[in-house]
Curated annotation (Swiss-Prot):
EC number assigned by the record: 2.7.4.3
Major subcellular site: cytoplasm
SUPFAM superfamilies, per database record: P-loop containing nucleoside triphosphate hydrolases
Superkingdom of source: Archaea
Protein name: Adenylate kinase
InterPro entries: Adenylate_kinase_AdkA (IPR023477), P-loop_NTPase (IPR027417)
Length: 196
């Protein structure tokens, strides 16, 4: 039976860093899969984009088709080994916010856990401004807060279609990265002990 833990958070929250560090500390033997990387691979192969940050500018129907293809690939991987799926619950597009997982995609993935990484909007804004490697859209602290609220709402909707448990982990500058990593390790170890 496929076993999937979804980890999500808006750009700049530290999700990918926390995930990579937690996998080094956990007893769990998850395979880290990045949903966006697989979508980007598919989109490049189809000649739709050349750079990852162009993904959010694709029309919603094209994005959904890519999501469905990628979800099937992830389930195939998860049949062989547990998957820690690094993704975004919602994606800000020029037309509005797109769910990272439409109903059909979440039903295919059927995750066991959904972990949301959050931080204060001011911290996220600061991290984005310091990250010169990415071509990120500029958002105000208010827009960042709204995006995080939408992520929580999306996680609840995902849980309704998958019976996943939801865990929120805060990654504040004063709290420390290590504490957020340790919280994720506890979730991953719990997942393995409960469902292995």
């Amino acid at each position: 039976m496929p076993f999937v833990v979804v980890i999500t958070g808006i750009p700049g929250v530290g999700k990918s860093t926390i995930t990579k560090l937690a996998l080094k500390k956990t007893r769990a033997k998850f395979r880290l899969v990045n949903f966006g990387d697989l979508m980007f691979e598919e989109a490049v192969n189809m000649g739709l984009v050349k750079h990852r940050d162009e993904m959010r500018k694709l029309d919603p129907l094209t994005q959904k088709e890519l999501q469905l293809k990628v979800a099937q690939r992830i389930v195939e991987i998860a049949r062989k080994e547990p998957v820690l799926l690094d993704t975004h619950a919602t994606i800000r597009t020029p037309a509005g916010y797109l769910l990272g997982f439409p109903r059909e995609v979440i039903e295919i993935l059927n995750p066991n856990f959904i972990v949301i990484i959050e931080a204060a909007p001011s911290e996220i804004l600061g991290r984005r401004l310091r990250d010169l490697k990415r071509d990120r859209d500029v958002e105000t602290e208010e827009q960042i807060a709204r995006h995080q609220d939408l992520n929580r709402a999306a996680a609840i909707a995902y849980a309704m279609h998958s019976n996943a448990l939801i865990k929120i982990i805060e990654n504040h500058e004063d709290k420390g990265l290590e504490e957020a990593v340790n919280e994720l390790v506890k979730v991953l170890d719990l997942a393995v002990s409960e469902y292995a």
